[in-house]
């Protein structure tokens, strides 16, 4: 039975690596996958899911205007699809999360979404909010704070390494712009 999955975490927990491994597992069994990533995330090149450990795969791009149900249905007419994988799922819109639930419910294709739960101000991203609400299965991917505790928050750092408290929710940057930390160190650094 197809399901909508949401694998969420903070930065540097291996979301893209896990996505790429899942896609490979399907392909190794001669099953077709369709991989998506956000058009606004071009850190490692446009139309590519890339892991920090160096593996990558070409991907379809989604924009705020993309109708994912229609796109996936069109791909399905060209070849059978066994799994849809979405990287940077925090950038999905509410409507796109609904469209992915329709892929699961009407097209009977499992959809695996990978993304951040919250931003640097500990606020939910739109895509994450609706995936947390509508996914059939939620799984947290874990990483650790510099103190060794589980990291579940992310700090945004400026070019001097100072913590940024205000600003736009979405700022595409590499690992040097963000730091995953535990709640204790998040509160200390943000000074709420």
Swiss-Prot record:
Main enzyme class: transferase
One Pfam family this chain carries? Answer: TK
Protein residues bound to ATP: 9-16, 87-90
Looking at the keywords, is ATP-binding present? yes
Q: Where in the cell is it found?
A: Cytoplasm
Give the Enzyme Commission number.
2.7.1.21
InterPro entries (UniProt xref): P-loop_NTPase, Thymidine_kinase, Thymidine_kinase_CS
Q: Name one GO molecular function term.
A: thymidine kinase activity
Q: Which UniProt keywords apply?
A: ATP-binding, Cytoplasm, DNA synthesis, Kinase, Metal-binding, Nucleotide-binding, Transferase, Zinc
One cellular-component annotation, GO: cytosol
Question: Biological process GO annotation list?
Answer: DNA biosynthetic process; thymidine metabolic process
Between which residues do disulfide bridges form? none
Q: Which sites bind Zn(2+)?
A: 145, 147, 182, 185
Assigned protein family: Belongs to the thymidine kinase family.
Q: How does it assemble?
A: Homotetramer.
Q: What is this protein called?
A: Thymidine kinase
Q: What is the gene called?
A: tdk
């Amino acid at each position: 039975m197809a399901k909508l999955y949401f694998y969420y975490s903070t930065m540097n927990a291996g979301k893209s690596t896990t996505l790429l491994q899942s896609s490979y597992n399907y392909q190794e069994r001669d099953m077709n996958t369709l991989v998506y990533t956000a058009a606004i995330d071009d850190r490692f090149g446009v139309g590519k899911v890339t892991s920090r450990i160096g593996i990558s795969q070409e991907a379809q791009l989604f924009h705020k205007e993309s109708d994912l149900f229609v796109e996936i249905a069109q791909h399905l007419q060209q070849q059978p699809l066994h799994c849809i994988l979405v990287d940077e799922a925090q950038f999905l819109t509410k409507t796109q999360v609904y469209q992915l639930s329709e892929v699961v419910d009407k097209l009977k294709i499992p959809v695996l979404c990978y993304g951040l739960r919250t931003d640097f101000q500990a606020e939910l991203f739109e895509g994450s909010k609706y995936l947390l609400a509508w996914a059939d299965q939620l799984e947290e991917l874990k990483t650790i704070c510099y103190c060794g505790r589980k990291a579940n928050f992310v700090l945004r750092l400026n070019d001097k390494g100072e913590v940024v408290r205000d600003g736009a929710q979405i700022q595409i940057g590499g690992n040097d712009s963000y730091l995953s930390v535990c709640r204790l160190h998040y509160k200390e650094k943000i000074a709420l």
